[in-house]
Amino acid sequence: MAWNVHANLLSFGIDVTMITNGENIVKTRYVDEKSNQQILRVDIENDVKPFKGNMPEGDFDALVISDYDKGFITTQQLFELVEWFDGPIFIDSKKTTLPVDDAYIKINDYEYSRLEYKDHPNLIITRGSKGAEYKGKVYPGEKVNVYDVVGAGDTFLAALTYGYLTYGRIEEAIPLANKSAAVAVSHTGTYVLTGEDVNAIRS
């Protein structure tokens, strides 16, 4: 969720201005104690009202959009945001129609299978333990004991943004994002990177 992306961006020392929906979405996960495997997830959510405010003024280094397609950002608004912002844009969205140009799109295997247009020049596909694929090249994931994949995509998105802003190349940002996601899945529940984690990832 957007709050998890926000929290991980803060862990990397990035100043963040966040706009999100005011409605609470509660996710309850039922996990088997012995195997630590999720058995069931129950979501309780109210209708989410579309965003109708103004974008904040100021100079921003990047625009990060975490969109679970609950209704806060319409498809039209998503395209308008990409056209409006003059700088690097990073999108993680469950929509099936996404901007083709001027943004890095991070999606997983399932989301990729649902895309209406798959020939995207800046598509980054996360493939779980296998890592991430970009322009036909697979960037291998870290070998770790996986306890919980919840929130790993959020961690990846935040780290990808930080890596790009730091190194200036998405090819260098992806390995850092893989390392960050590996830390997240090594813990149970939605995990936010600590300062110690970030120092280890950057070393």
Predicted ranges, named:
Residues N46, D59, Q76-P88, S93-P99, ...:
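Conserved phosphate-binding/catalytic region of the ribokinase-like
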Residues A103-D109:
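A short beta-strand/loop micro-motif in the catalytic core of glycosyltransferases
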Residues R41, A62-S66, F90, K106, ...:
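Structural motif
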Residues Y68-I73:
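Glycine-rich phosphate-binding loops at beta-strand->alpha-helix junctions
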